[in-house]
Design a protein with these regions (language model features):
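Alpha-helical structural signal
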Residues: 36, 54, 58, 129-132, ...
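Catalytic helix-loop patch of NAD(P)-dependent Rossmann-fold dehydrogenases
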Residues: 1-40, 44-55, 63
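C-terminal substrate-binding subdomain of Rossmann-fold SDR/epimerase-dehydratase oxidoreductases
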Residues: 63-261
């Protein structure tokens, strides 16, 4: 079953995948649908109000470190680049501390949602771009399903037929002679997972944060586990290049450089 808090988003994605699959099976088109895991990388969204888990966590830890160091110049630079609830670097120190505390950011301490136990998979965004180009240039739908001729029209169905879609005389995508053809999308990821707590520790290491990372178990964890099976993509000749520890360090370096821009 779909995870309740994510159901609408999941259904929208699944609908797109099935649409590509159905067009291919009915009309012999060559749409390739890729399903990425959680992405991170340059130009990520670091706004605390609506950011993804990794950039949000990274910024929180970074700001907690700056507060401890009493580095108000760096704090103001950060907030001028990305204000929090309208509070930028021109605000009074107390006002800045108040708004940051709403997001669990304090002097050398960060509070994060949940237990830290959920497992997540992360893919460097430039690896995602590379995988997409690889699939575009090297993969056809027939490579995915292992059948050269697969459209119901090719097998004699009428595109305006009135019969049941599972009939050879019908108009649907299903072709009884070929059996069931489904799950034709390609997962794009690393096939490796990490707990949210381990991710926080990796980020703390990259930021050189020595403070306290706390988890608020009264807040929701979300889906317990999100891991893609990337066997299909690996067999089609592509594998990720950037591992999570290197990626976290690269993302923080990008963030620091972006603050200087």
């Amino acid at each position: 079953p779909l995870e309740y808090t994510n159901e609408e988003y999941a259904l929208a994605k699944i609908s797109g995948l099935k649409m590509c699959e159905s067009y291919n099976l009915q009309y012999g088109t060559n749409y390739i649908a890729v399903m990425p895991t959680n992405l991170y990388g340059p130009n990520d969204n670091f706004h605390l109000e609506n950011s993804h888990v990794m950039p949000a966590m990274m910024r929180k830890i970074y700001l907690a470190k700056l507060i401890n160091e009493d580095n108000w110049q760096a704090i103001r630079t950060d907030l001028n680049k990305r204000p929090v609830e309208g509070v930028d670097g021109t605000a009074q120190e107390q006002r800045i501390l108040e708004v940051l505390s709403k997001y669990g950011i304090a002097d050398n301490a960060v509070q994060l949602w949940g237990t830290g136990k959920p497992l997540r998979e992360f893919l460097w965004s430039e690896d995602m771009a590379d995988a997409s180009v690889h699939v575009l240039l090297n993969v056809d739908f027939s490579d995915i399903i292992g059948i050269e001729k697969y459209s119901s029209v090719f097998y004699g169905a009428e595109t305006n037929g009135q019969n049941d879609r599972n009939s050879n005389a019908g108009r649907g995508g299903a072709i009884p002679a070929l059996g069931e053809i489904r799950n034709c999308h390609i997962n794009v990821g690393t096939g490796k997972e990490i707990t949210i707590k381990q991710l926080a520790q990796l980020i703390a290491q990259a930021v050189d944060f020595k403070g306290d990372i706390q988890f608020d178990s009264t807040k929701p964890d979300g889906t317990p586990r999100k891991l893609t099976d990337v066997t299909k993509l690996n067999n089609l000749g592509w594998k990720h290049k950037v591992e999570i520890d290197d990626g976290v360090a690269k993302l923080f370096a990008w963030y620091q450089n972006d603050l200087k821009a």
